[in-house]
């Protein structure tokens, strides 16, 4: 029976990795200007297609990574009750649902997406570094953390291009929410350290879901004139 379970678990893991790889290749195949190009023009529609696919990919990976960490490290520890409303991005005023988001002007919503993405640059870098040092950390968690860090940078770059097309010449100051959670990720106390990881992954899943929803709304509004 144990052998069958191990075999099934291995098959599911392989399927998950293959699915992630295929989606990653789909994302990378979308049109984008080559690095260093000067006169390359990508339509706003294509930029949004890529941004929406990237945001969905990041949210999928974030959810998988959180669920895997939760199952392996957080069972019976009561972390979820402590994680509510303790994200470093809580200082940014973000709409909680589609109805609230629809009330926000597209320029403000675009800038909000930029701020949230920038707020994750440093935490994602340290997440990768600290997961590497975790004893017996599943390799799949590290791979997902590395992939999310890379794709978040690509999404931020794409969003800057979108803002540049929607509002040419209007460059927003690089405002973002400062993260101060590194000491907690390095604590000697296991419970404190594991909760810090849990909370960070919980917040990443939450914010990636918000960004995914905001971008779908913005694409509908700016590309399809809200007819979707």
Curated annotation (Swiss-Prot):
Under the GO molecular function aspect, what terms does this record hold? Answer: hormone activity; prolactin receptor binding
Which Pfam families is this protein grouped with? Answer: Hormone_1
Any one GO biological process: female pregnancy
Q: Which UniProt keyword terms apply here?
A: Disulfide bond, Hormone, Lactation, Phosphoprotein, Secreted, Signal
Subcellular location, record wording:
Secreted
List the disulfide bonds in this chain: 33-40, 87-203, 220-228
Q: What family does this chain come from, according to its entry?
A: Belongs to the somatotropin/prolactin family.
Q: What is this protein called?
A: Prolactin
Which source organism?
Answer: Isoodon macrourus
């Amino acid at each position: 029976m144990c052998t069958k379970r191990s075999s099934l678990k291995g098959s599911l893991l392989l399927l998950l990795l293959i699915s992630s790889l295929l989606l990653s290749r789909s994302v990378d195949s979308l049109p984008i200007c080559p690095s260093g190009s000067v006169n390359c023009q990508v339509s706003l529609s294509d930029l949004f297609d890529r941004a929406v696919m990237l945001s969905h990919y990041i949210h999928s990976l974030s959810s998988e990574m959180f669920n895997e960490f939760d199952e392996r490290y957080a069972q019976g520890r009561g972390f979820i009750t402590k994680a509510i409303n303790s994200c470093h991005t809580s200082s940014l005023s973000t709409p909680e649902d589609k109805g609230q988001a629809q009330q926000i002007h597209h320029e403000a919503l675009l800038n909000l997406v930029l701020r949230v993405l920038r707020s994750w640059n440093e935490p994602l870098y340290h997440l990768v570094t600290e997961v590497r040092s975790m004893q017996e950390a599943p390799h799949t968690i590290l791979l997902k953390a590395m992939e999310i860090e890379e794709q978040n940078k690509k999404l931020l770059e794409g969003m800057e291009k979108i803002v540049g097309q929607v509002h040419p010449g209007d460059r927003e100051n690089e405002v973002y929410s400062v993260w101060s959670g590194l000491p907690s990720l390095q604590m000697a106390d296991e419970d404190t350290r594991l909760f810090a990881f849990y909370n960070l992954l919980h917040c990443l899943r939450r914010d990636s879901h918000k960004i995914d929803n905001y971008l779908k709304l913005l694409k509908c509004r700016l590309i399809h004139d809200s007819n979707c």
